[in-house]
Swiss-Prot record:
Pathway: Protein modification; protein ubiquitination. Component of the anaphase promoting complex/cyclosome (APC/C), a cell cycle-regulated E3 ubiquitin-protein ligase complex that controls progression through mitosis and the G1 phase of the cell cycle. The APC/C is thought to confer substrate specificity and, in the presence of ubiquitin-conjugating E2 enzymes, it catalyzes the formation of protein-ubiquitin conjugates that are subsequently degraded by the 26S proteasome. Its main location: cytoplasm. The gene is APC9. It comes from Saccharomyces cerevisiae (strain ATCC 204508 / S288c) (Baker's yeast). Pfam families: ANAPC9. GO terms for cellular component: anaphase-promoting complex; cytoplasm. GO terms for biological process: anaphase-promoting complex-dependent catabolic process; cell division; chromatin organization; protein ubiquitination; regulation of meiotic cell cycle; regulation of mitotic cell cycle. The keyword Protein transport does not apply. The APC/C is composed of at least 13 subunits that stay tightly associated throughout the cell cycle: APC1, APC2, APC4, APC5, APC9, APC11, CDC16, CDC23, CDC26, CDC27, DOC1, MND2 and SWM1. InterPro entries: APC9. This is Anaphase-promoting complex subunit 9.
């Protein structure tokens, strides 16, 4: 009985068979097939060497090694420029997605979204020429087209992001729009202090010397001062308006009875 039981147990026990795509031989044979256009291995090699030609490799190798493989300096520079061009073509989509591989259409949509966000932040309408070659991930500045347009049309307030700044006139705003931050003369700090003091005193007198003015910052003070000026203008208009006096009850009765007496006559 025991021998028969051991034989039956030996027949029942079997190692689980692995599917063909999980075997080590299959994985080793198809390891090179998991490549995408973005992660494609370079086909250019140096003298049957598996190391691809990039800018870092050319910098590490000395001039003697380069001449040893029968390559001129011009050829090395040409290959170096090609490698930099390939690096610039690859768009860095890692801030938007954690996946290692994506389709070209998805990467293109990420790039268009980033370009649109740039236009919303730094432009009111967008790029004048509608350029699609701008790369926000490589260059911060999109070019001088918008600056030339602003300098050619200084009267056009529609293209200016800065509409009003405390203590700055129209010429100062035009300089800021042209990114002329560095000036030869020092800024007129006394003029700015006078403006801030004038606004602070006006708010204090209107609020009956309240301590709230001291807790506000300069830009909040300027906003409150503008609101105060609008309110004072409205109050002045109401006072200057010719208002009809309210008729009293005695005058209403007299007018009523006088009309009745005239009707009897």
């Amino acid at each position: 009985m025991n021998q028969n039981g051991d034989k039956n147990e030996g027949k029942l026990f079997q190692l689980p068979s692995l599917p063909p795509w999980k075997t080590p031989r299959f994985n080793k044979a198809n390891f090179n097939n998991f490549t995408t256009p973005l992660r494609k291995r370079s086909t250019r090699v140096i003298n049957d060497d598996s190391m691809p030609i990039t800018g870092e490799v050319l910098e590490e190798r000395t001039a003697d090694d380069l001449y040893g493989i029968n390559m001129d300096v011009d050829e090395v520079d040409y290959l170096n420029t090609l490698s930099h061009i390939e690096e610039e073509k690859q768009y860095d989509y890692s801030p938007f997605c954690e996946r290692n591989t994506l389709r070209e259409s998805r990467i293109d949509s990420f790039l268009k979204a980033e370009r649109a966000a740039h236009c919303l932040v730094f432009h009111k309408v967008g790029h004048l020429d509608g350029i699609d070659s701008y790369r926000p991930d490589i260059d911060i500045m999109c070019g001088e087209e918008a600056n030339k347009y602003d300098s050619a049309n200084p009267e056009g307030n529609g293209s200016m992001l800065l509409e009003s700044v405390p203590g700055c006139n129209k010429e100062d705003l035009e300089r800021l729009s042209r990114r002329e931050f560095v000036t030869n003369s020092k800024p007129n700090m006394r003029r700015l202090d006078d403006i801030i003091n004038h606004e602070t005193n006006a708010l204090k007198s209107f609020w009956n010397d309240s301590g709230l003015v001291n807790s506000l910052q300069s830009h909040h003070l300027h906003e409150e001062y503008l609101l105060l000026q609008e309110e004072l203008k409205n109050v002045y208009k109401i006072k200057c308006h010719d208002r009809v006096p309210i008729e009293s009850l005695r005058d209403k009765c007299r007018r009523h009875y006088s009309n009745e007496d005239s009707s009897f006559l």
